[in-house]
Amino acid sequence: MARKPLLLEKWDFIVLLGESGGGKGTLVRNMLGYWLPNLHTASMGEVFRRKSAEDPSLKEYTEKGILVPDDVTCGIFREFALANTPGLIDGFPRNRKQAIDLIRFAKENNWRVLVVDIYCDIEHIIQRLLARKREDDNLAIVYSRHKQHKELHPAVMEELANRPDLFDVIRLNGNRHSEIVFTSFLLNVLRLVDMLYFYDMTNISTDFLVNNDETTINPAINRWMCSFLTSIQNKMNDSN
């Protein structure tokens, strides 16, 4: 079976990390809308909720915000990743055991993975999640998930950061406006694919990037960068 084209000749897969409400979903929508419309994506949370509707034994985990067993989580990831390359999954890995499984999986398949980690203050998370008015987003569950994330996430990043042969890591500030987060993501992608001449050029004029309110990015810069990256991806696809 022929190997599928990589993202920018560099990555087989993207894993998106961070707390629920930190801006992961918005980043994915921007990626699909502006840059990678055909990227295969999945949220572990969405998959769990679908499965809990079919399997009562899983419903307790989603209702109480408890982590789903690692063997179930890793199995769901592996199944999705093998069928959808290049692709993206939101919410995996969430603890050290899952991170070790991801390392093993990447090594077995000779994959290079882009890790996108979004950090966000609890105040912003609460504001966003309660506005969603979803059943499993009540305040007690939000705090419980936040506590779990603070306890488990450092070990995940430690494991992945120790394997630069398999992973590239981008860290994003989810407290900022979603347009700024997306721009930061794109600039980091350009840096990682060694297009530093563009990355450095954008620092010349802040006015080129920021609108008059000084809080949001001029949409033209995101459209330009996405067009630029898409043209590279298309040329690479045509050569395969």
PLM segments and residue spans:
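Glycine-rich phosphate-binding loop of ATP-dependent small-molecule kinases
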Residues: M1-N240
